[in-house]
Amino acid sequence: MVNTPEYRTLIGPGELAECIDQVVIFDVRFSLADTQAGRQLYQAGHLPKAHFLDLDGDLSGPVGPGTGRHPLPDPVELGTKLAAAGVNSEAQVVAYDDSHGAFAARLWWLLRWLGHDRVAVLNGGCAGWQAAGLPLATALPQPEPGQFQPQLRHDLVVSSEALADLLEQSGTTLIDARGAQRFRGEEEPIDPVAGHIPGAINLPFAANLDDSGKFLPAEQLRQRHEHRQAIHMCGSGVTACHNILASCHAGNELPSLYVGSWSEWITDDRRPVATGE
């Protein structure tokens, strides 16, 4: 895998097809409405050699009092799962989904958090792979296990307490990846409280994409992600990773993530909530 070109943000279907025997691929398709749908889709057909990881069961930890809907997984447990699929310190990892990168970006960010930089999201996802005339498979991969030792990047994670302190300081930029109507508090289909954290800027993650569902070119993303030192959030620490990925693809340094995001913020009714713009 040492000779494989490094992909640290995005990889196209053709590029992946050329190096598919030298990479470790993860299918992270998922549906918030039907949590078994992703696994069922994987069983019906997936990219050759792809392993399945579940957002709730593998890419998140247990939900508890005061947490958001998708807390961080135990890094040792996740590292063990990655190693079982063949990931080692030099592996090129690729993640894909069928949600325009919304869930694949979570795995991308988790690997960066674990200290592994050679990870990319398949631009266009499963649909883009098929549109390029590339095949799906049903056979389960039989990898040679790797040796993977997490090297945690604690600087990439912001807690609720730290965020509250930072927001009292001038110069802190908080970016919320949720859709505009949820941000403004006009609707809230998932969480029990509507609105946003006062002072946050709304940059819906879907605007990182073109009409075909692929990421915009880096120069266009650079105009959108001008806040290079921002803290990113969303509803539960998932789609915020999409904005972080887009920011990195634009050439910015890896920003930090408020993992608990909105669903954790509202577990304490002493924390302020805003509505409107």
Predicted regions and their residues:
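Cytosolic catalytic domains that perform sulfur/thiol-centered chemistry
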Residues: 1-277
